[in-house]
């Protein structure tokens, strides 16, 4: 699988759907190593209705989720993991450096530094216009579909 990936290719790798699919395209992809993706943040995002009326700001937890989805594309592009679910196992060192607002292109870079069996870890960075918006260590566990509620 080679970048760039558009919405159809992303949906083949991830189970997320609107309104919770938070990646519009994957610009760079090294399966199991690294992925770079973009979310074009529009005024029409459903979360802006309540966060915050008159002062729309993308919730920080959704920035972290978007980074995790980019990382999941990087993992799910590896044949061994395709079709599994990547579930959050932990989030460390989260820092928000800049607000993300309508009109921003949120560029997310995830380096996967551990991928072994049923667990993985990556370092996510998110930028708007070259300015760092967020950073986090992302830990995840893999489940077979149908196993995630156990």
From Swiss-Prot:
It comes from the Bacteria. It catalyses: a (3R)-hydroxyacyl-[ACP] = a (2E)-enoyl-[ACP] + H2O. The active site is at residue 51. It is found in: Cytoplasm. Belongs to the thioester dehydratase family. FabZ subfamily. Involved in unsaturated fatty acids biosynthesis. Catalyzes the dehydration of short chain beta-hydroxyacyl-ACPs and long chain saturated and unsaturated beta-hydroxyacyl-ACPs. This is 3-hydroxyacyl-[acyl-carrier-protein] dehydratase FabZ. It comes from Rubrobacter xylanophilus (strain DSM 9941 / JCM 11954 / NBRC 16129 / PRD-1).
């Amino acid at each position: 699988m080679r970048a760039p990936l558009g919405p159809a290719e992303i949906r083949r790798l991830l189970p997320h759907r609107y309104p919770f699919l938070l990646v519009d395209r994957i610009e760079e992809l090294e399966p199991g190593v690294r992925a770079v993706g973009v979310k074009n943040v529009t005024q029409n995002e459903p979360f802006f209705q309540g966060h915050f009326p008159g002062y729309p700001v993308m919730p920080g937890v959704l920035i972290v989720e978007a980074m995790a989805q980019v990382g999941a594309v990087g993992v799910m592009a590896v044949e061994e993991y395709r079709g599994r679910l990547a579930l959050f196992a932990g989030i460390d060192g989260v820092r928000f450096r800049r607000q993300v607002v309508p009109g921003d292109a949120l560029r997310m870079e995830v380096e996967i530094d551990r991928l072994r069996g049923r667990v993985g870890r990556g370092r996510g960075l998110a930028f708007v216009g070259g300015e760092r918006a967020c950073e986090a260590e992302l830990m995840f566990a893999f489940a077979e579909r149908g196993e995630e509620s156990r």
